[in-house]
Regions:
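Single conserved hydrophobic/aromatic residue that forms the stacking wall/gate
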Residues: 1-7, 11
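Helix-loop segments that flank and shape redox-cofactor active sites
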Residues: 16, 22, 78-82, 102-121, ...
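Conserved alpha-helical segments that form or flank metal/cofactor-binding pockets of metalloenzymes
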Residues: 27-29, 33-64, 126-149
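Long, hydrophobic/aromatic-enriched structural stretches that serve as scaffold segments
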Residues: 62-117
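Acidic/His metal-coordination segments adjacent to aromatic residues that form catalytic metal sites
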Residues: 70-94, 152-176, 192-193
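Alpha-helical scaffold segments that form or flank carboxylate-/histidine-based iron centers
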Residues: 85-95, 114-131, 167-171, 196-210
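Alpha-helical transition-metal enzyme core signature, strongest for iron centers
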Residues: 95-103, 125-140, 172-186, 205-210
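Long, hydrophobic, well-ordered secondary-structure blocks that form the structural core
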Residues: 102-163
């Protein structure tokens, strides 16, 4: 209840800004770039493709740490593929939960950021995060069919950022902590997945996050 109350208090501190002067700064450039690089998760991704059920989604050139374990080596090929699906689903579930957290933070910033440019940028980023939530959820639901709950450590981190009263630290928390960590994980999975749909999906998400 305390966490919920603190989060709702953010909306009591929304900041109107009646100065609509457009400053030619980095935030304005990021907003313009976001408009130029817009994409539609429903039509720009090849959802008709489904990775073969007898092939792994993730198979890097180098051996993954768990592949050296005797317990893993004792699995049948079918069990290894099932392990791959669960392992990928767990990772992508955390992506999904993290992007929902980023969506909530960005929407808060659109309300409480003090400048006109910052509000526009936060609004555009809110749409980016909504799109990421959409495509990660659709891939998990339609292509893997497995979903994992949020990691408690990730939930704690998101709660800290969501309930902080300071808009500037909220902005830093989203850009450096949430998005910074996510970008590295997205790039890693993009590099090692054998699923062209997942690779295409991550290409667009990484492009958004790297702006």
């Amino acid at each position: 209840l305390a966490s919920s109350s603190a989060a709702s208090d953010v909306y009591k501190r929304q900041a109107y800004n009646w100065d609509y002067t457009i400053a030619d700064n980095r935030i304005k450039k990021l907003y313009e770039l976001g408009k130029e690089l817009n994409w539609n998760g429903s039509i720009d991704l090849n959802w008709d493709y489904t990775h073969p059920a007898d092939e792994k989604l993730v198979e890097p050139d180098e051996e993954l740490p768990h592949e050296a374990l005797e317990a893993y080596q004792a699995l049948s090929e079918e069990e290894k593929i099932l392990f791959d699906r669960h392992n990928t689903a767990e990772l992508m579930s955390q992506f999904l939960h993290g992007e929902q957290g980023a969506l909530l933070v960005a929407s808060q910033l659109a309300s409480c950021a003090p400048t006109y440019n910052a509000k526009l940028y936060a609004a555009s980023q809110t749409f980016d995060e909504a799109r990421h939530v959409e495509v990660f959820n659709r891939y998990l639901q339609d292509k893997i069919g497995i979903h994992y709950p949020i990691n408690p450590a990730l939930k704690l981190l998101l709660d800290k950022i969501l309930t902080d009263e300071r808009w500037d630290l909220k902005f830093i928390g989203m850009q450096i902590i949430i998005e910074g960590l996510a970008l590295a994980a997205f790039q890693m999975l993009k590099a090692i997945t054998k699923d062209p749909l997942l690779k295409q999906l991550l290409h667009y998400v990484v492009r958004d996050e790297a702006r």
